[in-house]
Amino acid sequence: LISDDLDVIARAIAAVDEAIAASVPGVVGIHIEGPFLNPAKHGIHDPAKFLALDDSAVDLLSSLRNGKTLVTLAPEVAAPGVIASLVARGVIVSAGHSLASFEDMESAAGEGLSGVTHLFNAMTQLGSREPGLVGAAIDLGLISGLIVDRHHVHAAALRAAYRAKGADELMLVTDAMPSV
């Protein structure tokens, strides 16, 4: 589910809860990508849907009764303690659509952020003096999603990520989305 109004997110969470309760094969949880993202890295997301991550949003994001919830957010737009609150409620938190610095990522990982959504895309890149989000993903051992269609990420970057992180820290991402 990409960035949308909170009522749409609430309905999606309820639908996933019902599907898991009904033992629908293959449904194990929900990935909510946004709307707590950096507008400068919006990608396909509509920045008009972006919101502040407040207590009511934390309550909603942690409301799935069955299965797992994965939330992608931009760590630099989350107030201190918000990531820790989500993690304490069982939510898996991943960074994406972000201008986070390496230091932002260290703080977020310290609060329990454990992943990176679509490594290399819509995030700060690895530089010699500013490792950025990509550098943090590598250095901090964060599980990283990777779109391997050779359109989103160059084949050489895919190989470099695999060599740097290994199979245990990478997951394949389809980036499936409705036609736009």
Question: How would you name each of these model-derived features?
Answer:
Residues D104-V180:
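Active-site-adjacent C-terminal substructures of enzyme catalytic domains
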Residues I2, P35, A176:
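Short, well-ordered beta-to-alpha junction loops that form the rim of enzyme active sites
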Residues L1-L6, I147-D149:
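Conserved strand-turn element in the central/C-terminal portion of the radical SAM core barrel
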Residues D5-P131:
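Histidine/acidic-residue-rich, glycine-tolerant segments that coordinate divalent metal ions
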